[in-house]
Amino acid sequence: MKKLGTDLLKRGFAKMVKHGVVMDVTNVEQALIAEEAGATAVMALERVPADIRVQGGVARMSDPEMILEIKDAVSIPVMAKARIGHYVEAQVLESIGVDMVDESEVLTPADEVNHIDKRAFTAPFVCGARNLGEALRRIDEGAAMIRTKGEAGTGNVVEAVKHMRAVNEGIARVIGYKEMGLEAELIQMARNELKVPMELISEVAELKRLPVVNFAAGGIATPADAALMMQMGCDGVFVGSGIFKSGNPAVRAKAIVEATYNFDKPEVIAEVSKNLGEAMVGINIDEIPEEMLLAKRGI
């Protein structure tokens, strides 16, 4: 019988990459640059979100052979993406030994109603969220890590900021109700608004934060972007298109790592922000047609 990983073990792995940067890479060369720059993990995928956005079509799990080549080349953890609800893609990724599965809205959803039952897997999962309800529903399904959805492939951090602020505001409400002894309001919030078990709400109230590691993702393109998200309370950052769509990926990757570690030191962020070359060309969110917004996938 297959032995499933416990929540404790899965969340423990997620904590190992805390305070660090996870970088999207599409080949071994990029993975080595990311490792050299100090990434705590890499996300192996065939197309970064910016390319997926431009090229369109159905975006699926990457070729397992490509993922294995990257795993063989680096000593840091390797993550990979599965489509929302596509539990067979997740089974494949687990079988080849990826360290974490990202059930990602960047890929074309396979199921518009259900997410993967992540408790049925040994591998830990990370999932995106726009607010406290989405975050806690994914945790209830077994996610070991949460990240903001942001709006991937845009180089525009505004949506990640919006999502992190929404999570923080939701947590503040839970804490406030708890401190005022408003148990009935908490129960109603859990049942009707967030649609999660009361036990999760109690855990948030006790910890005064999400029960799992919470990273920023979606639109992070500069060292200052990374530091902004860390100052908002994120535990680390994912950087997708922002590094390898820039003019000098190796230098920018190191700078974002430095800014993430030194997020509360403006003088360090200023220093590492010098002479980075061209950042990726960004997209204003209001220029994206409604049907092309990725963050709305999977609620």
From Swiss-Prot:
EC number: 4.3.3.6
Domain of life: Archaea
Chain positions recorded as D-ribose 5-phosphate binding sites: D24, G153, G219, G240, S241
InterPro entries: Aldolase_TIM, PdxS/SNZ, PdxS/SNZ_N, RibuloseP-bd_barrel
Gene Ontology terms: biological process: amino acid metabolic process; pyridoxal phosphate biosynthetic process; pyridoxine biosynthetic process
Substrates-to-products reaction catalysed: aldehydo-D-ribose 5-phosphate + D-glyceraldehyde 3-phosphate + L-glutamine = pyridoxal 5'-phosphate + L-glutamate + phosphate + 3 H2O + H(+)
GO terms assigned for molecular function: pyridoxal 5'-phosphate synthase (glutamine hydrolysing) activity
CDD domains the UniProt entry points to: pdxS
Cited function: Catalyzes the formation of pyridoxal 5'-phosphate from ribose 5-phosphate (RBP), glyceraldehyde 3-phosphate (G3P) and ammonia. The ammonia is provided by the PdxT subunit. Can also use ribulose 5-phosphate and dihydroxyacetone phosphate as substrates, resulting from enzyme-catalyzed isomerization of RBP and G3P, respectively.
Subunit relationships: In the presence of PdxT, forms a dodecamer of heterodimers.
Entries under PANTHER family matching the protein: PYRIDOXAL 5'-PHOSPHATE SYNTHASE SUBUNIT SNZ1-RELATED
Protein name per UniProt: Pyridoxal 5'-phosphate synthase subunit PdxS
Organism, scientific name: Methanococcus maripaludis (strain DSM 14266 / JCM 13030 / NBRC 101832 / S2 / LL)
